[in-house]
Amino acid sequence: MKKVEEQAIYTGFTDIHNHILFGVDDGSPDIETSLKMLRMAYEDGTRDMVLTPHFHPKRGMAHYSQIVENYEILADLAEKELPDMGIYLGREIYYRSEVLDDLDKLQEKAMCGSDTVLIEFSPNVEEEKVRSAVLDVIMTGYHPIVAHVERYVCTVKNWDYIYELKQLGADIQVNASSVTGDNGWSVQRCVKALLKDHVVDYIASDAHDITSRTPQLSKCYKYIVKKYGVEYADRIMKADVVEKFG
C-alpha cells in the first residue's frame, strides 16, 4: 500500500462545490475572505475551482448579474496572485419544480454554462421527490449532479436508493469532510460503501469559510488513495473541468 501512496500526486485537485464567491450567499462575506479561501485551497493542492453560490430561498438568491460581477472581480484578482488556478462559475440549486420552468434562467445556473446542474434538497426530503427531480432535470435536457448525497436522511438510511439515482442518470457528489468522518459515523459508513462500489463521481469541499468548513481536499485524497486506490481517487478528485463541463 505504501508503494501505491507514493505513486499519488498530492496536488491538482478540482473542487466543484464550494461557497467561496463573496457576498452572494451564506459563504464568504467579502473579497478578503474569498482570497484567503482560494489561497488555502491552492496551498492544499487544489488547482481548479468551480464556484457554486446558493440558489436557495434561505441561503442565497443573489441575482445572476451580481454573481457574474463578483465572479469577475475575484477571478481577476486570483489570476494575478494564483495564475495557474482555474476559476469557473456554477451554482448550487435548491431544487423546486419551478426552476425548470424557464430553461434560459436554468442555463444561468448551470456548471460553467454547460448542460450540467448541481442540485440540492432539504435534509428531510423524501426519496420520491429526489427521484422525480432527477428524472425531470434529465427530461429538460440537463444532466444532474446530486450535491452532498450523504446529507439527506433518506439516503443515509437507504444506501440502495443512491445506487438507483445513479442508474437513473444522476452523478453523485459527496463532501470531503464526510469521507474523513467529520460529519459522524453513520454518514461516513454510508460514504465508505459508496466509495467501495465506485458510485461516487465527485468529491468536493462545500467550503463556506476558513475555520470550520474549509476548502481543503488533501486529507480526503490521501484517505481515498489508501483505501480505494490512486486511479479512483484521481478520477473523482481531479476532474478536468473543460472535459466535464465544457
Q: PLM features: what roles do these ranges have?
A:
Residues 3, 217-246:
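Mid-to-C-terminal alpha-helical segments outside catalytic/metal-binding sites
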